[in-house]
Amino acid sequence: MAAKDVKFGNDARVKMLAGVNILADAVKVTLGPKGRNVVLDKSFGAPTITKDGVSVAREIELEDKFENMGAQMVKEVASKANDAAGDGTTTATVLAQAIVNEGLKAVAAGMNPMDLKRGIDKAVTAVVTELKALSKPCETSKEIEQVGTISANSDSIVGQIIAQAMDKVGKEGVITVEDGTGLEDELAVVEGMQFDRGYLSPYFINKPETATVELDNPFILLVDKKVSNIRELLPVLEGVAKAGKPLLIIAEDVEGEALATLVVNTMRGIVKVAAVKAPGFGDRRKAMLQDIAILTAGTVISEEIGMELEKATLEDLGQAKRVVINKDNTTIIDGIGDEAQIQGRVAQIRQQIEESTSDYDKEKLQERVAKLAGGVAVIKVGAATEVEMKEKKARVEDALHATRAAVEEGIVAGGGVALIRAASKVAGLQGDNEEQNVGIKLALRAMEAPLRQIVANAGEEASIVASAVKNGEGNFGYNAGTEQYGDMIEMGILDPTKVTRSALQFAASVAGLMITTECMVTDLPKEDKADLGAAGMGGMGGMGGMM
């Protein structure tokens, strides 16, 4: 086991604070409408330019082990805020730095760290309650656009596109961000249910100019097994041929003789057929087949419930207005399913989302809800260069997370104003003893830090602006972008309540742990031992000289 280096008390805290300040100073220059960029060197490829706090934090690793521990703990604050609300990482870092600096001063003055922490926790709990009281619902498209614009670092086009996407697919809908091909940002909306499986044979293509299969008013056969024997399919094929409609087969797989016969029938024009694999795997595939069945008023032919493919009739088939299949995706448009049943299925999946503990499962279930309920929107980010594309895509994703958070928990005045208002409301809060009162005061004082940093980044005098904002009331604040005072919500400077709340809670949590740190332990650097092999060779040379 390697030898350890141990530091106690003030020595440990001074080192830790140095690390906290290095990381926070690098991150906080990005805060606000006039925040600056940070350039990150990569071991390969071009440097990355970013204004995203968490991206800067993730890159920082310090040489001094003790300083690095401080930096890593603040990095944890930024990551946690990012995971919870998708934004607010820089605000969280600034708050953590302010609380740690104020707290360690109090510890150095002889205060009891545990009571300070209790005071900080009391202040944060009271302020979070006030933030929830100040919060107003984010309902209109205009408000969604404003939240998106602020989170994308005042890029109004991003705000507009996110608001349009939410209008098209609903606030619960799935919105994804992809690399675009042009210079402009674009919004594409996939109507109907789309899943990522394409045609099983290119011979099914009936629109060669677009390399797609298009079926109008098709029957849809859903099978929960592999189909390789054409005999099983004959009764359904005969029924469909008599009805004179096309057929889409969605099965675990269609192979061998069955696929060959379907291709021949299609090419001869006897019956128009296309086959695709069912989406997903295992239990998720069964669930998605059931989703498609409800959407198209069909039945999944599954041996688990005693149904045989040979005995399937036209009544078991689903129907839709149109189906479009390319080599990668299948889209079912306007299934004839009963609206009440579809809503029932959506409610059932939402219940599963509530109960699920895995983020991955939640995301997949959310996608299923969107496919059943409204469709999927894709924001294609346009840029002139690869470097700009990466930076812009990160901003769009941030803005999307922020707007979702705003829809979830509402909005408060932005620009650091909400924290100042909430802090002033609980200014009379008392702890159990004087040291807790000091903890409460220092936490409330630290809540001015985001506003001060936004103003400092805009090149103004932070103390003057902070004093003016504190003397105002309601949503009165300072717009650093236009250098004007006024009503923040009317000026469109909004923050999602969830983002502000998460930033404060995570910052206080980690800062409290750092204030109560009394000892730090790290590995001693290993000393390189002299290379004995090389020394031996030298001796050999000497012997050669003697001979």
UniProtKB/Swiss-Prot annotation:
<dbReference type="GO" id="GO:0016853">
    <property type="term" value="F:isomerase activity"/>
</dbReference>
<keyword id="KW-0547">Nucleotide-binding</keyword>
<keyword id="KW-0143">Chaperone</keyword>
<keyword id="KW-0067">ATP-binding</keyword>
<comment type="function">
    <text>Together with its co-chaperonin GroES, plays an essential role in assisting protein folding. The GroEL-GroES system forms a nano-cage that allows encapsulation of the non-native substrate proteins and provides a physical environment optimized to promote and accelerate protein folding.</text>
</comment>
<dbReference type="GO" id="GO:0140662">
    <property type="term" value="F:ATP-dependent protein folding chaperone"/>
</dbReference>
<feature type="binding site">
    <location>
        <begin position="87"/>
        <end position="91"/>
    </location>
    <ligand>
        <name>ATP</name>
    </ligand>
</feature>
<comment type="subunit">
    <text>Forms a cylinder of 14 subunits composed of two heptameric rings stacked back-to-back. Interacts with the co-chaperonin GroES.</text>
</comment>
<comment type="similarity">
    <text>Belongs to the chaperonin (HSP60) family.</text>
</comment>
<dbReference type="InterPro" id="IPR027413">
    <property type="entry name" value="GROEL-like_equatorial_sf"/>
</dbReference>
<dbReference type="InterPro" id="IPR027410">
    <property type="entry name" value="TCP-1-like_intermed_sf"/>
</dbReference>
<dbReference type="GO" id="GO:0005524">
    <property type="term" value="F:ATP binding"/>
</dbReference>
<dbReference type="Pfam" id="PF00118">
    <property type="entry name" value="Cpn60_TCP1"/>
</dbReference>
<dbReference type="GO" id="GO:0051082">
    <property type="term" value="F:unfolded protein binding"/>
</dbReference>
<feature type="binding site">
    <location>
        <position position="51"/>
    </location>
    <ligand>
        <name>ATP</name>
    </ligand>
</feature>
<feature type="binding site">
    <location>
        <begin position="30"/>
        <end position="33"/>
    </location>
    <ligand>
        <name>ATP</name>
    </ligand>
</feature>
<feature type="binding site">
    <location>
        <position position="495"/>
    </location>
    <ligand>
        <name>ATP</name>
    </ligand>
</feature>
<dbReference type="GO" id="GO:0042026">
    <property type="term" value="P:protein refolding"/>
</dbReference>
<keyword id="KW-0963">Cytoplasm</keyword>
<dbReference type="InterPro" id="IPR018370">
    <property type="entry name" value="Chaperonin_Cpn60_CS"/>
</dbReference>
<dbReference type="InterPro" id="IPR027409">
    <property type="entry name" value="GroEL-like_apical_dom_sf"/>
</dbReference>
<feature type="binding site">
    <location>
        <position position="415"/>
    </location>
    <ligand>
        <name>ATP</name>
    </ligand>
</feature>
<dbReference type="InterPro" id="IPR001844">
    <property type="entry name" value="Cpn60/GroEL"/>
</dbReference>
<dbReference type="GO" id="GO:0005737">
    <property type="term" value="C:cytoplasm"/>
</dbReference>
<keyword id="KW-0413">Isomerase</keyword>
<protein>
    <recommendedName>
        <fullName>Chaperonin GroEL</fullName>
        <ecNumber>5.6.1.7</ecNumber>
    </recommendedName>
</protein>
<dbReference type="InterPro" id="IPR002423">
    <property type="entry name" value="Cpn60/GroEL/TCP-1"/>
</dbReference>
